[in-house]
Amino acid sequence: MRFRSRNYINSWGRFFWFAAFIVSTFVLFNGFSYSNFRFLFGARFEPVLKFARKTPTANAIVSGEHPVTQILSVRETVLLPDQVILFLKYPRSARLFTKEELECVYLSVHNPSPVPWLKQSPARVDTEQLSEQIVRCPSGPRGLLITVGSKLNGVFPAGPTHHWDSLAYEALVDNDNTTVVFVKGLNLRLERVFNASRFECVYGEDFSRLKLVLRSEVLSIAQEIVRCRTPLIVLNSKKKVNSSVKVSVRIKGGGTLPSIARLGFLSDSGRDPLPTRKPHETCICTMARNQARFLKEWVMYHALIGVQRWYIYDNNSDDDTDQVIESLFNAGYNISRHIWPWVKTQEGGFSHCALRAKGSCEWIGFIDVDEFLHLPSGLFLHDVISNLTSITTSFGNISIGEIRVSCYSFGPSGLKRIPKQGVTVGYTCRLVVPERHKSIVKPEALNSTLINIVHHFHLRDDFRFIDVDRRMMVVNHYKYQVWEVLKQKFYRRVATYVADWKDEQNVGSKDRAPGLGTRAVEPVDWSSRFCEVTDTGLKDRVLQNFANPKNSLLPWQTTSNKKARPWFVEEKNTSKVQEKEYRLL
């Protein structure tokens, strides 16, 4: 009997330890598998949303006292200086809410009640993809949790909240299969390459558990751009991780930047980055905020001198910019709007644009909407570029990767209201000496760090830049327009390393309007300032070549939905397909 009792005890002991081993193994395996094995072996890989606090709204959608079926989730929330950006994710079959149906909801962090402390209408709602939206809400009082709701469905659960001053916010896989990560918070110096060995890139769902993320080498780091070696498992699972895997940057021995940067892949990623023939000879990229009333003239004019493709990075516009771009696209212009809500990131936006344009554009210019390329010779832009690069290379036996064009700064020219015929005709008085330059670059010539200071990029060692003779090409920069337009520059400057005009910092910068100080107060003599020489070169050419001879209207003054072309042209058939060769007068 004693022997049987001892065996009974030993059996239960062995069973206990066996059961404990099975349970611990299951827990370990289960925790590891969701962040690694499911990713590695191609199973569905989804982000885990963590709520800032546990309240009834964080676990169910609240409509009065009764929860309703979840229609959307707030994937991420970013607190910008003067507004809040919320990224919404819908089920694939769900109907997306309109701006009128959504509300910005502000909940008390300390009060567990689901009753909203405040509700406001969103400033804007943009559809990014078929099942995703970007909602811009006004900043609320401190200490409030911000989410969205609808009048019919109640309040939706809040998503994880991030502060803008420390964040990885965008990520693209380049043609060479490296990952380019765009970050805020490293505070690196302008135009300096930093020691990459002090950092590493991390890929995964939850960066608070470093044992469960993939790590990779940082190849270069400069300003706010980090280039990483992409893990092979990420490249091989491209289709599965496109909207799931996030990327961030970790300081070795320190912390990891919070991240909302989900991997994006270029359409030609992994292919030859230098195709024999690209679709477009000349393209233009810009970053703009509330430039709807000037965008039509800017696009149409540059189309008439030979630009074929436009990339518009919309930096939190709340005017009709999206509608103007849509109308231009419908009229036949190859133009796209890229939502770029990130404040003071013009350098990063231009680098992002250069990556996107690499497979499509032989040359791409980076200019603002108040800047117009003027070709005094009457040639088209691609002809000027071809002449510049062929002449230089025949003598120097080097490759030209960047063309730098001098900028003439125009003043109000005696006007007090926005000119009806457009800026190219209305403003005719400027400063004598050029201010700075802008660049037209060959995307594959850019240094891998993608360093730029808005006006030009750093190039690879086997490429050089050239300065263009102002008799061949200049930029007419309508910098100091009528006060109604000029005062908008006091809102915020878009460049990272440029102080806002309202700040006392760097008051003497060339970016500012001399003599204005830090307050948007119109000087009595504003309309006559910055006028040292009369220059009607571009005005004359625009009126001669682009005005309708019947009514003298310019293309951007009409409501036509057809693509504009010069009124005076020479036409000839060059192949079986009817083609036209235009020559400006």
Where do the model's predicted regions map?
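Active-site beta-to-alpha loop of glycosyltransferases that engages the nucleotide-sugar donor
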Residues: T286-M300, N316
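Long, charged/polar, low-complexity intrinsically disordered N-terminal extensions
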Residues: M1-V135, S139
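Short, acidic, metal-binding catalytic loop of nucleotide-sugar glycosyltransferases
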Residues: M300-Q308
